[in-house]
Amino acid sequence: MDIVSIAWAALMVVFTFSLSLVVWGRSGL
């Protein structure tokens, strides 16, 4: 596994986490 795929996977995880965090925040949780 090279550094590019690791960085891409980390970026996807951070993007998904922040997106769900925004959705939960707007839901008033």
Curated annotation (Swiss-Prot):
Could you state one GO biological process linked to this protein? Answer: cytochrome complex assembly
Keywords, sorted A to Z? Chloroplast, Electron transport, Membrane, Photosynthesis, Plastid, Thylakoid, Transmembrane, Transmembrane helix, Transport
Q: Which InterPro entries match?
A: Cytochr_b6-f_cplx_su8_sf, Cytochrome_b6-f_cplx_su8
Against Pfam families, the record matches this protein to: PetN (PF03742)
Record keywords: Oxidoreductase included? Answer: no
UniProt-annotated location(s): Plastid, Chloroplast thylakoid membrane
Gene Ontology CC entries for this record: chloroplast thylakoid membrane; cytochrome b6f complex
Superkingdom in the source lineage: Eukaryota
Give the GO molecular function terms: electron transporter, transferring electrons within cytochrome b6/f complex of photosystem II activity
Q: Which residues cross the membrane?
A: 3-23
- Its primary localisation, in coarse terms, equals plastid
The record gives the membrane topology as: Single-pass membrane protein
Q: What does this protein do?
A: Component of the cytochrome b6-f complex, which mediates electron transfer between photosystem II (PSII) and photosystem I (PSI), cyclic electron flow around PSI, and state transitions.
Subunit annotation? The 4 large subunits of the cytochrome b6-f complex are cytochrome b6, subunit IV (17 kDa polypeptide, PetD), cytochrome f and the Rieske protein, while the 4 small subunits are PetG, PetL, PetM and PetN. The complex functions as a dimer.
The UniProt entry's sequence similarity note says: Belongs to the PetN family.
Please give the name of this protein: Cytochrome b6-f complex subunit 8
Instruction: State the species of origin.
Output: Angiopteris evecta (Mule's foot fern)
